[in-house]
C-alpha cells in the first residue's frame, strides 16, 4: 500500500482517515465516538513520532494506520465514558459531598 504523507496531512475528518487507509468502519460507531477516536488516534500519532524519529514516512504511515485501527477497535467494545480520554472526565467534581462521606447520627 502506498500512502502519501502530504495527502495524510490534509485529512480532517475521521471518515477521511478511514478512507485514506482503506480501513472498513461502521459509520454509526464513528458518528457516536468520533471525537474520542480522533483523540486516541492523535495521542498515538504523538507517541509514534516521539518513539520512531528514524522511521521513514512510509513506516510512520503504516504505524498511523495501525493506530487508527486500534483507536477505532477500542470503541467497538467500550464507551467514551469508560475510556475517559478528555480532561473533563478526569476532573474531580467540586462542591460535591459523596453519600459515603455523610455520617449518620
Swiss-Prot record:
Q: Which UniProt keywords apply?
A: Nitrogen fixation
- Pfam families per UniProt: NifW
Among its keywords, does the record have DNA-binding?
no
Name the domain of life: Bacteria
Q: What induces it?
A: By anaerobic conditions.
Record-level GO BP terms: nitrogen fixation
| Keyword NAD attached | no
Described by its record, this protein's role is as follows: May protect the nitrogenase Fe-Mo protein from oxidative damage.
Q: What does the sequence similarity comment in the record state about its family? A: Belongs to the NifW family.
Which HAMAP family has this protein been placed in?
NifW (MF_00529)
Full protein name: Nitrogenase-stabilizing/protective protein NifW 2
In which organism is this protein found?
Trichormus variabilis (strain ATCC 29413 / PCC 7937) (Anabaena variabilis)
What gene, per UniProt, encodes this protein?
A: nifW2
